[in-house]
């Protein structure tokens, strides 16, 4: 684009409040931190040596993997395959939540009417087979990921993109259905793979039939040694095309990144202590306090740290499947939540390490507080016919608090009494040894999980529910089986974590939108179907300023919390990690927004002793 064109676009943005953008990057809101000629990100060591290895366990509850295709619903792909083997047009940073810089695309140009964006591909970009990354590959990837053969979340994420047009060998245009400041970022997040991936005699297989075909991506790593279902190693591509790019300088320094799979937390932790792998993130406060101890920690062989971060909090809770008749009445869901004594759990089990999750955007500016503000009311009033009056007149619901003070009105007995009143209003009364509805059906609840770690929480919760006449069955199954049941919504209550975002947007359609409630494999596991929620999500994704986004998300949070779709859990403001001493070095500056596993594998590097050991192994 000419200098005059850039100046004109900047002037238009200034006058009309358009999203800020520049050829080398795009910012949804505000300014772009790094200029076009920047050398490297501040939080990396540009001179980090290459070599050595790091071995980890996946931060999820993955217990197996059976495919190399991370883009389809059936089966489980290895951890980090998408981020290490495949790449996107733009790449985000760990210090700017709503800005992305050119990776496969060397520049992005937003149309003056903001209804399309053109990405120009970097002529250096190459797939692992040596082929250039071309516009036709970008279109192919988009078409495949929005087809019925792909996992449903991709059709939701890219639902506001009407299509992709190849303009030239290295230029591709994404066409948008409406003006939406997030859409260039969404387009830029498209994973790109070669048209040749899955080809058989020049004919492409449907995406869902590409299972164990070796991926043809452009990322810094290729698949190395694999023990299917148990462990996988990624080998650094020494001829990686972007190794000298500013957005990759100082990144991906290990020659090998390996992941090991263990069946449960106990086996995993014991293996870590025995030296089977290098790095682990802890999620259970009791384990962190009592199990991450011993001779190896005392001697300094193993290091445990609590790392500060600026991430938005994750929403974690026991999620109700509101497709089940027993959970359709909000009073039943609210009553069940009253039976969980978080304060007791925090004292007795969690070493007072947690704060209570309050809303769906915990720990961020997007969390609703008090009564609706004037800005929220302006959003809620047009939806009055869909909402209960208390949304407008009462403070946003808070998770129940259990007090030890008998005069507080909030003892466990008080909460259970309130729960019983709600259940009675909903038609559930105690008779014949159980809580029953007018048809005589007993209220029984199955808590489904893939690990028994939550059992110590469910047990006291179940005892309180039994006082109301509700019987609880806590069932632990393999993660792969659990995932299959979640995909078809075959559950009653699950413990689940909804990952937070510094700028929530289109992903909310799949998490809370009515359409996603009926799509197998979608993230709306709670089955939320609410016209007000749909309307507010639509407002969120069309926000043109950060202030608009804040008010719209607060209104959405308020409506969701009045729906009592989950029993909120707890969260921590730190990352708990442990790793082997003397094997790694880290940049001097820690970024603000990061996940520990990605931070370690992306920008840490091997220590001299690690490099020396690796050199001996190679010889």
Regions found by a protein language model. Name each.
Residues 8, 120, 155-201, 218-227, ...:
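Surface-exposed binding/hinge segments that line
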Residues 163-166, 224-235, 260-324, 331-335, ...:
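Extracellular/periplasmic solute-recognition and catalytic clefts
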Residues 102-106, 128, 133, 175-195, ...:
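Aromatic-rich, solvent-exposed beta-strand/loop patch
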Residues 44-49, 72-80, 107-151, 167, ...:
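Aromatic- and charge-enriched surface segment that lines or borders ligand/interaction sites
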Residues 75, 81-96, 188-251, 255-258, ...:
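Gly/Pro-rich hinge or "lid" segments in bacterial periplasmic/extracellular proteins
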Residues 25, 58-60, 80, 227-232, ...:
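Detector for C-terminal structural segments
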Residues 122, 209, 242-292, 334, ...:
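Ligand-site clamp/hinge motif
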Residues 23-112, 140-143, 216:
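N-terminal lobe/hinge region of extracytoplasmic solute-binding protein
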């Amino acid at each position: 684009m000419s200098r005059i064109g850039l100046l004109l676009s900047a002037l238009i943005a200034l006058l009309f409040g358009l999203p800020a953008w520049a050829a080398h990057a795009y910012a949804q809101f505000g300014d772009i931190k790094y200029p076009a000629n920047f050398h490297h990100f501040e939080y990396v060591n540009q001179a980090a040596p290459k070599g050595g290895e790091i071995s980890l366990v996946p931060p999820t509850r993955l217990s197996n993997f059976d495919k190399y295709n991370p883009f389809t619903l059936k089966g489980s792909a290895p951890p980090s395959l998408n981020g290490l083997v495949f790449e996107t047009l733009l790449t985000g940073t760990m210090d700017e939540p709503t800005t992305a810089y050119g990776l496969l695309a060397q520049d992005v140009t937003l149309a003056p009417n903001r209804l399309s964006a053109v990405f120009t591909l970097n002529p250096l970009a190459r797939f692992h087979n040596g082929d250039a990354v071309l516009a036709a590959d970008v279109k192919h990837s988009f078409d495949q990921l929005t087809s019925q053969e792909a996992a449903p979340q991709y059709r939701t994420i890219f639902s506001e993109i009407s299509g992709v047009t190849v303009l030239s060998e290295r230029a591709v245009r994404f066409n948008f259905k409406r003006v939406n400041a997030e859409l260039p970022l969404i387009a830029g997040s498209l994973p790109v793979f070669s048209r040749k991936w899955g080809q058989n005699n020049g004919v492409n297989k449907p995406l869902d039939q590409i299972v164990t075909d070796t991926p043809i991506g452009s990322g810094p790593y290729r698949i190395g040694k694999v023990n299917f279902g148990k462990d996988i190693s990624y080998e650094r591509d020494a001829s990686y095309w972007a190794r000298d790019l500013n957005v990759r300088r100082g990144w991906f320094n290990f020659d090998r990144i390996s992941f090991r799979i263990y069946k449960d937390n106990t086996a995993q932790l014991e293996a870590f202590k025995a030296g089977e792998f290098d790095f682990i993130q802890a999620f259970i406060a009791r384990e962190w306090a009592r199990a991450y101890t011993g001779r190896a920690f005392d001697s300094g062989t193993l290091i445990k740290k609590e790392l500060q971060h600026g991430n938005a909090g994750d929403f974690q809770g026991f999620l109700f499947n509101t497709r089940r008749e027993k959970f359709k009445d909000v009073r039943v869901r609210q009553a069940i939540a009253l039976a969980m004594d978080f304060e007791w759990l925090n004292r007795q089990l969690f070493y007072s390490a947690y704060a209570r999750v309050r809303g769906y955007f915990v720990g961020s500016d997007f969390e609703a507080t008090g009564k609706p503000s004037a800005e929220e009311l302006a959003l809620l009033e047009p939806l009055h016919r869909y909402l209960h009056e208390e949304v407008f007149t009462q403070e946003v619901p808070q998770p129940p608090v259990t007090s030890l003070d008998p005069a507080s009105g909030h003892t466990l007995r008080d909460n259970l009494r309130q729960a019983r009143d709600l259940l009675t209003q909903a038609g559930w009364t105690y008779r014949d040894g159980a809580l029953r509805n007018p048809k005589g059906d007993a209220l029984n609840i199955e808590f489904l999980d893939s690990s028994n770690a939550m059992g110590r929480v469910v047990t006291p919760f179940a005892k309180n529910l039994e006082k109301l006449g509700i019987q609880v069955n806590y069932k632990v199954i393999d993660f792969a089986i659990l995932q299959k049941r979640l995909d078809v919504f075959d559950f009653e209550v699950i413990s689940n974590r909804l990952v937070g975002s510094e700028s929530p947007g289109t992903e909310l359609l799949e998490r809370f939108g009515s359409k996603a409630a009926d799509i197998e494999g979608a993230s709306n596991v709670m089955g939320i179907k609410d016209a007000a929620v749909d309307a507010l999500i639509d407002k969120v994704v069309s926000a043109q300023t950060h202030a608009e986004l804040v008010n719209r998300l607060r209104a959405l949070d308020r409506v969701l919390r009045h729906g009592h779709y989950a029993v909120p859990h707890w969260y921590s403001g730190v990352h708990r990690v442990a790793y082997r001493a003397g094997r790694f070095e880290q940049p001097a500056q820690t970024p603000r927004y990061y996940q520990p596993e990605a931070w370690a594998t992306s920008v840490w590097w091997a220590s001299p002793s690690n490099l020396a050991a690796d050199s001996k192994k190679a010889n």
